């Protein structure tokens, strides 16, 4: 049983805790919040004994083996480093950090302290994503890939009203590519590895983050186009095209439905049932990595390549974070 703590008390933290408990491999033993009242309110639903308003105190506690980090993006690196250096296993929400330098430093820290560092990118852990990977040979020679995630942000009106929510604030290492565009990018890396080159364009808001963008990656015989937006909705599915047919994926981040369309023939539904809480699978994988002490697991390479591409995409589109000027 992995005794774990959480940083953050929002909806995604609650969903992860429920998934972790559903797996039967975890027990929530500590909650951190800047507000003791907020920590207590969250803890009441899960019978948690240890509450903290100090990250340092929680890192020094002997009540936890692992921590789930769901704080703003800009805080991921410093919090991850703190717990890794105290030999606490870390599962951190995507993106793992603000840039490649931070990701490299975090991976080095995990190896130095011989603990597991895991980026919580749930898509790659889903049964239908594994099915998608296994189905790739069906399309024959790969030619074109289109991954799409465009969703009008519930916080965009607040931005238009003159507020500066975290979602559109570069101080929090945020924006479209770092948020929902990440699912498209990391999915491509998980399936196809590192591209030969990347070209990116984006529309920037006055705050300095990207509102929407397009990324084109060259893999030689085939190309991958990523479309992302936080200021518009899209009803288009994602698609992997080959000379023998195409794979169609509805809602890529959740892999809700996967179909194969042979060239000149009818669509075939390949979809497998998935748990209603799609965070279950990443919770199970992280537990396996911790139980088997797999510090150098394959996910680290995907995280590093994704961070490298994110950093280059932001360089090309002119999105700059305060973290980019910090020397590590």
From Swiss-Prot:
Listed transmembrane segments: none
Group of enzyme by EC: oxidoreductase
Pfam families in UniProt: GFO_IDH_MocA, GFO_IDH_MocA_C3
EC number: 1.-.-.-
Single GO MF annotation: oxidoreductase activity
InterPro entries (UniProt xref): Gfo/Idh/MocA-like_OxRdtase_N, GFO_IDH_MocA-like_dom, NAD(P)-bd_dom_sf
Similarity comment: Belongs to the Gfo/Idh/MocA family.
Protein name: Uncharacterized oxidoreductase YgjR
Organism (species): Escherichia coli (strain K12)
